[in-house]
Amino acid sequence: MGKKARFKEARRLQKRNLNNAIGSSSINSQNSLTNDKIGKGKNKGPTERYVLPFEKNNRFLLLGEGNFSFAFSLLLHHVSSEGFVLATSYDSKEDLKQKYPDAAEYISKIEINGGKVMHEIDATKLHLHKKLKTQKFDTIFWNFPHSGKGIKDQDRNILDNQKMLLAFFKASKFLLSEKGVIVITLAETKPYTLWNLKGLAKDAGYTSLMTEKFDSSFYPEYSHRRTIGWIDGISERSPWKGELRDSRHYCFVVNGSNIKPYNQRKEKRKRSELSDDSSDSS
């Protein structure tokens, strides 16, 4: 067995051990996502139809992470040894501890598994960050973006988020590789459907590559967190599960890109291709 093969096997075993360990970790006290899904009609586990909006060997930049559970689940299940994940939060490290008590454990597992984490990353100023502006990424992922300013007036709230997203699109161009794709996930409800996301992308010089209905069951460790953070005594009693909302991935590429939409490629993704073993043995 060559050096590369040994590395892949070691990572496969590490992922399996981490996945087994997660069930008994303190994360489970605040993340009952897997158990909550059992028996619910609209969440019967991964479906054959969901198409991952990325390749497993991509260089990923994740923005606006809350408790970093999505980043961990992505890295654990869908990133090969050739891939790389840089997960970031807008919050400072100290604010993160207060808002998301379970974040520290997810961050630790991300780093153990080969990913990196950064804090205080403003998605609208990526091109100005000294550690990011020289890097290139194949997938820039932002799940459920929101300015988090608590603006009560809906029209002003929509405008504020549109300004944020337009600035993000413009800043991201400097960090995209030649095959780079931006993936934004939004709930399919108001006010998000009023943001005119595709129009904003077009104004910034992007073309819509594809859209794909988000299936959170492919990210079993993922539990969505509100921008305001976790509130003891309230959040754990709330039936609201952000990751279970009807949501959609919107994928964009820079104008002139010849990237083919993932859901139109000849090799259809099957459930077996998404297992831990296959992601590390190819």
From Swiss-Prot:
Main location: nucleus
EC number(s) stated in the UniProt entry for this protein: 2.1.1.-
Location in the cell: Nucleus, Nucleolus
Polar residues composition bias: residue spans: 18-35
A GO BP annotation: rRNA base methylation
Catalysed reaction equations from the record: uridine in 25S rRNA + S-adenosyl-L-methionine = N(3)-methyluridine in 25S rRNA + S-adenosyl-L-homocysteine + H(+)
Pfam families linked: BMT5-like (PF10354)
Region called Disordered, residue ranges: 18-46
PANTHER family: FERREDOXIN-FOLD ANTICODON-BINDING DOMAIN-CONTAINING PROTEIN 1 (PTHR11538:SF26), PHENYLALANYL-TRNA SYNTHETASE (PTHR11538)
Record family assignment: Belongs to the class I-like SAM-binding methyltransferase superfamily. BMT5 family.
Record-given protein name: 25S rRNA (uridine-N(3))-methyltransferase
Taxonomic source organism: Schizosaccharomyces pombe (strain 972 / ATCC 24843)
